[in-house]
Amino acid sequence: MTMNSSIIKNEQAYLDLLRLVLNEGTEKGDRTGTGTLSHFGAQLRFNLADGFPLLTTKKVHLKSITYELLWFLNGSTHVDYLQQNGVRIWNEWATSEQTARFNRPAGDLGPIYGHQWRNYGATTTADGQYNSDGVDQIAQVVEQIKTNPNSRRLIVSGWNPGEADQVALPPCHTLFQFFVADNKLSCQLYQRSADLFLGVPFNIASYAMLTHMVAQVCNLEVGEFIWTGGDCHIYQNHREQVELQLTRSLYTLPTLALNPNVKDIFAFNYEDISVDGYESHPAIKAQVAV
């Protein structure tokens, strides 16, 4: 596969990208000391009418994806909400050793995704906390989709260069843009750093879920989710897992169901979101690089 070949959509495109990076990626060092095979610049397209893009070639933990997205939308940056709901995906970055790097207590991840989405550019208090005087980008973009759907400014940015060194992990999925055409809502994500085996399957499902949620509250149908990656990499200690995944056949994608009574993007609860018909191969364990 080359990156300018004919467009292949949905999960097969993801598998083709894994194969490309595994076979042709450049060996590079990285911040974690693990080492990667890397490829710069890739795009995957998922037609959301074909199903919900939750990978079937390995089981993906939907509960973690759903709670994390609700956590982002709530504007929270502390892991207590996740941990109370049995989600551990941020634990490695929430230790006292990690948070001491930017002078915060254990569990406080700093101004990461939720803060940037809901309170971008907020001023700080004397104790280093944030006032509620920033830009609520989510509320703003939903209102713009409703009132000015032809706008080319339907953008949310998680990347704040002035705060990128004040967080447990600078945002990997940095910016997303919505697009409305023919009464359908599409979303494109730009991900600066893409851990193809562990992280990207979560990111694809999370932003596809968000697209469904925003579409519902804006009375639109869903169109495409488009994932665009910058540094697309496979960690050296994930190579065997990737090779195993590439031996597996595809199942039909499941469908996402939302409680149709929810009309406010901030009113969704975990129980309002479900996936039907998810059939997959078993999970494949791998170590996260911190």
Curated annotation (Swiss-Prot):
Residues bound to (6R)-5,10-methylene-5,6,7,8-tetrahydrofolate: 61, 195, 289
**Ribosomal protein recorded as keyword:** no
Domain of life (superkingdom): Bacteria
Name its cellular compartments: Cytoplasm
Q: In which pathway does it act?
A: Pyrimidine metabolism; dTTP biosynthesis
Q: Which InterPro entries match?
A: Thymidate_synth/dCMP_Mease, Thymidate_synth/dCMP_Mease_dom, Thymidate_synth/dCMP_Mease_sf, Thymidylate_synthase, Thymidylate_synthase_AS
Which EC number(s) does the record attach to this protein? 2.1.1.45
Q: Which family does it belong to?
A: Belongs to the thymidylate synthase family. Bacterial-type ThyA subfamily.
Record text on subunit structure and interactions: Homodimer.
HAMAP family xref list: Thymidy_synth_bact (MF_00008)
Could you tell me what this protein is called?
A: Thymidylate synthase
Q: Organism classification, top ranks?
A: Bacteria, Pseudomonadati, Pseudomonadota, Gammaproteobacteria, Moraxellales
